């Protein structure tokens, strides 16, 4: 592989007209003495890794020619004119820009990873939107009716069954009095087979119309004005 070296940026550089037109001219910088080397590479080796020997320090370089491909010498001669010569400073700038230019060409030919939709993007596109959560009011816990409420309810039903013409207000008043005067019934202290012991209590004013019936108070008339609890 033929080559010519350039000793320093300030020295004159020979025109590479003596290279074969069937080969490709590339410029490589020696990593030991920093000399610019003009390398004549055959077209069959443009995309291979070749070994270049520096003509100044005899250092061997392993060069990947894919990143050092530059226009052919005859094309550079036509662009620069018949009496123009290569400037080493321009060659250094071209060498620095060659890898970036190659990367730009590769990026234009092949899509980047950012252009390829990821699996997460496809999953998000086909994902069914979830319904917003509904703020349900807290469920009200059903309270167990107390012994008093159960007794009053059952007592009102019993009084109305014995006297259908009685009003609900009078039945409630009688049921409340039965609850107050017979506390032993509340806790089941008396068995069902034993008779209920009646309590001898003096009747107060306003209770003349109340009569004892089966151990409970019950109104004697339907028009008794008693205020419920």
UniProtKB/Swiss-Prot annotation:
A zinc finger (C4-type) spans 30-57. It comes from the Eukaryota. Residues 120-180 are annotated as: Participates in DNA-binding. Changing residue 30 to Y: In fil-2; abnormal abaxial determination during embryogenesis and organogenesis, filamentous flowers. Residues 45-107 are annotated as: Involved in self-interaction. It is found in: Nucleus. GO terms for molecular function: DNA-binding transcription factor activity; transcription cis-regulatory region binding; zinc ion binding. Binds 2 Zn(2+) ions per subunit. Keywords: Developmental protein, DNA-binding, Metal-binding, Nucleus, Zinc, Zinc-finger. Belongs to the YABBY family. Involved in the abaxial cell fate determination during embryogenesis and organogenesis. Regulates the initiation of embryonic shoot apical meristem (SAM) development. Required during flower formation and development, particularly for the patterning of floral organs. Positive regulator of class B (AP3 and PI) activity in whorls 2 and 3. Negative regulator of class B activity in whorl 1 and of SUP activity in whorl 3. Interacts with class A proteins (AP1, AP2 and LUG) to repress class C (AG) activity in whorls 1 and 2. This is Axial regulator YABBY 1.
